[in-house]
Regions:
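Structured, contiguous alpha/beta core segments that scaffold functional sites
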Residues: 1-188
Length: 188
């Protein structure tokens, strides 16, 4: 498969994507604070508004979570800029393509090229400025998406569909003979 648009032509992949992204988008968000070995629910936190009422001026929390989960599904990870500059925190999804750098102290920096009104064309973010979600991961740092994990299976399914389409398009009429050990009549 060459990417999400190609993979979405596979019915099982499209169904899995739709089911997973819709389910994740509907999930309620609860925040907890660790206090030693116990967790306590947090009722007031700057991120609660963005996660439960309005992610940004263009997205509801449902849409934001669906977009982020979709990026995770396809590419293994999703990034959103945590904008703390206004009276309310905003979460702005970032493009999929990025470069990661580490500084001498071990801090991670991510460079994105964006085409949005809110951000510069190319911008570098420290990991503390980002919400970083991963689909599957082997090391906790990088995500692995369905396109990478199931590349061969998706490709096989798409090629099978293509073959079957050509087979029937060329006038194929599969037929065969079925043999049974007894005589068939109207009663059976």
């Amino acid at each position: 498969a060459r990417g999400p648009s190609s993979a979405l032509t596979s019915s099982p992949v499209a169904a899995a994507h739709r089911i997973l992204t819709n389910a994740m988008a509907c999930m309620p968000v609860d925040l907890y604070r660790k206090d030693g070995s116990r967790r306590e629910s947090v009722e007031k936190h700057p991120s609660l508004y963005a996660l439960t009422v309005r992610a940004n001026e263009n997205m509801s929390p449902y849409t934001f979570k669906k977009v982020m989960e979709s990026k995770c599904f396809w590419y293994g990870e999703a990034f959103a800029y945590i904008d703390r500059s206004g009276p309310l925190m905003r979460l702005i999804p970032l493009p999929d393509a990025h470069q990661m750098y580490e500084d001498e102290q071990g801090g991670r920096w991510y460079s994105f090229t964006a085409e949005t009104k809110e951000l510069d064309l190319t911008r570098k973010f420290h990991e503390d400025e980002l919400l970083h979600l991963r689909f599957e991961t082997g090391n906790g740092r990088y995500g692995i998406g369905i396109l990478q994990m199931a590349r061969d299976a998706i490709r096989t399914d798409l090629l099978s569909q293509k073959y079957a389409g050509k087979f029937y398009k060329q006038g194929a009429r599969p037929s065969g003979i079925i043999e049974v050990p007894t005589k068939l009549d109207q009663a059976n």
